[in-house]
Structure formats: C-alpha cells, structure tokens
C-alpha cells in the first residue's frame, strides 16, 4: 500500500513540494517536509535531509536523524557512536523504526552498553528488551554501578523485563545504595525474578525501623508476588504491616 501511495506522491510531483518545505527558512516548516519524506519512504530524499542531522536546532536535528534512520538501508550499528543526547521520545522512535522496518537487532548491540553517550546506553537496553536479547546479561548487571541514575534505573527495569535471574543477588546488594525511587524499581524486578533468597532479603528489610511507607508497601507487594503463602502467614502481629497487607489484598481499601 505504501508503495502505491508513494507512486501517486511522485506522479503528482508532491515530493518537490516537500523539498520546498525542507528548504524553507523556518525550522518547523523544514520538519514538515522531512516528515513527508519519511512518511512516503522517499529514499531519494536522504541527501536533502542529511545536512540537518548536525543542525544546532535540537528538534530539527532530531527529526532529520530519525528520518535518516527510517530511510537508510544501512544497519543501525553506527548509532553506537551517536554523540548527541536522545530524548525518551526519540528513543521510542528509534525502536519504532526497527519495528516498522522489521530489522534484526544491531550486531554490535552489546557495545551500546559501553557507549560514552548515556542515552545510547539506555536505548541499547530498551532495544535488548524489545528483542528479548539476554546475551549481554553480565554487562547489564555491571550497569547497576553506573554513575548516572537513569542508566541504573533502565538496567534495573531490564533485569526484570528480561528475567535475568542471575542478577538477583546484585539487586540485593544494590538496594541500600539507592534512593527511594530505585529501591522501589529494584523490588519490582525482584517480584519477577525473586527466589527464596529474595524472600529472606525482603523479610530482613521489613524488620528494619523507620522504613519509608512506599518502600515498605513495595516490599510487601514483592513478597506477595514471590511467595504468597509465606506473605499470608508472616508479620501478623505487626499492626502497620497488617494494614498494608489488607490494602494489598483488597484494591477497594
């Protein structure tokens, strides 16, 4: 269907109109023309898009780069060296390009986790989850010590999504190093991959005093997911935990 539409697009010389938009002095009009070429899969238009891939305007540069990825026949392996930070929206656009083009996972995807650009590291993790790629599990676990919180967060999420059971102990060790947000994300991943070891870990943490209530609730939710029978029979004399369990057991409370 797209090929028929493109033939009509070219037959009526609408690509020339799109090119006029790309050459327009205003960046927002340029973006419309670029999006035309992308939507029509107008491969011959790449040469007009490429100059804007280095534009100082972030939005124009982003639109040009995504259109280039969509139109190119080259693999996305080179993206590992992309120097400019990607927004979350553009990360999902890249994944959408992979989906729409039915591309295979980049051959060097494991190297993306070592990229200097943190957003490429995050994108690499998202792509691994998209393809259910588990061959780089050690590198994913290594990212739990990354200096950037967004990278650590994505690594924690990926461990749960990819069901990396070998990362269970690493998540236990990371728990006390993180602030509230990532503590909760760790517990969500443990709810997926956790074993009896995590039951013991969570039980010990629940015995601590002065726990944040949201973290405490997530501890119980994770425990319930891993071993529901154990969850039902423990902490029955702790009034606060008992109230929280009642809330978890009944969504209407």
What is each of the regions a protein language model found here?
Residues 232-253:
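Terminal, low-structured helical/coil segments at or just beyond the last alpha-helical repeat
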Residues 25-26, 56-60, 86-90, 116-118, ...:
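Short inter-helical turns and helix N-cap capping residues of alpha-solenoid HEAT/ARM repeat scaffolds
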Residues 2, 9-22, 42-53, 73-83, ...:
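Amphipathic alpha-helical scaffolding segments comprising HEAT/armadillo-like alpha-solenoid repeats
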Residues 20-48, 53, 57-62:
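Structured extramembrane domains adjacent to transmembrane segments
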């Amino acid at each position: 269907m797209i090929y028929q539409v493109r033939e009509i697009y070219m037959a009526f010389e609408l690509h020339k109109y799109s090119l006029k938009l790309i050459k327009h002095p205003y960046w927002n009009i340029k973006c419309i023309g670029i999006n035309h070429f992308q939507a029509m899969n107008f491969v011959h238009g790449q040469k007009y898009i490429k100059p804007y891939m280095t534009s100082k305007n972030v939005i124009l540069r982003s639109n040009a780069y995504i259109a280039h990825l969509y139109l190119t026949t080259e693999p996305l392996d080179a993206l590992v060296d992309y120097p400019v930070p990607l927004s979350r929206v553009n990360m999902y656009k890249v994944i959408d390009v992979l989906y729409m083009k039915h591309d295979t996972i980049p051959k060097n995807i494991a190297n993306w986790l070592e990229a200097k650009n943190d957003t490429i590291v995050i994108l690499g993790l998202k792509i691994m989850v998209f393809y259910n790629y588990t061959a780089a599990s050690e590198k994913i676990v290594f990212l739990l010590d990354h200096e950037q919180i967004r990278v650590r967060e994505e690594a924690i999420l990926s461990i749960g999504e990819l069901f990396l059971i070998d990362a269970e102990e690493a998540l236990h060790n990371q728990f006390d190093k993180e602030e509230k947000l990532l503590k909760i994300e760790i517990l969500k991943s443990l709810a997926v991959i956790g074993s009896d070891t995590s039951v013991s870990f969570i039980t010990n943490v629940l015995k601590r005093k002065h726990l944040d209530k949201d973290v405490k609730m997530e501890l119980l939710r994770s425990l319930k997911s891993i071993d529901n029978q154990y969850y039902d029979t423990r902490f029955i004399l702790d009034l606060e935990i008992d109230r929280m369990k009642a809330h978890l057991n009944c969504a209407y409370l």
